[in-house]
Amino acid sequence: MLNCNYYNEIKNELINNEIYKRVKDYSKNRNELSVYYNVGKLLSEAGKHYGEGIIKEYSRKLTIEIGSGYGISNLKRMRQFYLIVEKGVALPHQLSWSHILAILPINNINEINYYISISIEQNLPYRQLREK
């Protein structure tokens, strides 16, 4: 009987830890996606006023001031992410940026929504989503 109590306490601790990790990750994902959406929106608006070359200029400056990770292709992906959301794709916070990158090449909104739903329903890791 005593053995069972220890087990339950250990199990509860581990379950609570798993829940915390997921909440923490979802919070992190939500923030990251929100930031990338906002950056994409600003890039889209800046592009209308200053032309496509603005992404190259911003990329150069951001890389100098903040560091790597803000290359031209990444900034273009952020803009593409914003444009997809604006077309009506609802992106749940469970998806990581890697998941988003896997669906960005898809042009059909229904296909995008399909892959988002199977990603969540089947809890697909990024690599498995990319294979589909």
Where do the protein language model's features map onto the residues?
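Basic, low-complexity intrinsically disordered segments
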Residues: 1-132
